[in-house]
């Protein structure tokens, strides 16, 4: 089924494919479902060409252990698929994998369709609140350019807010659909951001997962070791070099990676605070990295009066992720 609507004088077509969506596959509407067309990406963003290598399979790829290569791939994907003129982030800030972030947006679209007679709502009548928009502004980019949604992005970090603003100002297709707001008080998530006259269709969030800087470092080290094993397996010459911490691709500021109590405490705080804004936000949603936290999160949502609670699974190959959603209305 194809849904066609007019979005700010632009026709937006959303292809609702009938392909099955399992926990091991990307969403059927995810344009990254079939991998990276490197030749086309290099045409859209020539800088990527210097980072392209040949994998053991014979296919073109990049070295995912190199931050510059991953950043170039992200820029190419966002320019090629999402109509940007440019994309960049300051050094040391989170460089998110685009396909997984797109899955969250498509999962949200399906969630909103449940309240819209099974039809994905499109256009700027849908307004999303991105808690922690980051320097990359990845969710507003994908959501606005795929479905025409409007976004407000919040953050506590001045550099991140400046970067997100720069991205909007340098991309005419994004600028009218993204506004940023600073959270001045780290103790709050919604307070100070949601204004009395605001009404959001949904909120979304990629929370800080870890409890401390030490735990975040350990998690990054595990990823480094995993990349090292994969690189040695796929290296053609047998001269694979060890991947060390200073080659780490998993960048991110402290507020992007960890907070006191980790993701469980953060999401429970979000649930508690969401009660005050239940009439101004349709669906509250948040990514959850650890499945063992799900029961406690649902218990908290029910305790604070959520009438609906959902878990939406997402899959990118061997990686399984999910987001939770709750609302206070039937």
From Swiss-Prot:
GO terms for cellular component: cytoplasm. The keyword Methyltransferase applies. Specifically methylates the adenine in position 1618 of 23S rRNA. Its EC number is 2.1.1.181. Disulfide bonds: none annotated. SUPFAM superfamilies: S-adenosyl-L-methionine-dependent methyltransferases. It is found in: Cytoplasm. Keywords: Cytoplasm, Methyltransferase, rRNA processing, S-adenosyl-L-methionine, Transferase. Its main location: cytoplasm. It catalyses: adenosine(1618) in 23S rRNA + S-adenosyl-L-methionine = N(6)-methyladenosine(1618) in 23S rRNA + S-adenosyl-L-homocysteine + H(+). GO terms for biological process: rRNA base methylation. HAMAP family: 23SrRNA_methyltr_F. This is Ribosomal RNA large subunit methyltransferase F. The keyword Iron-sulfur does not apply. GO terms for molecular function: 23S rRNA (adenine(1618)-N(6))-methyltransferase activity. Belongs to the methyltransferase superfamily. METTL16/RlmF family.
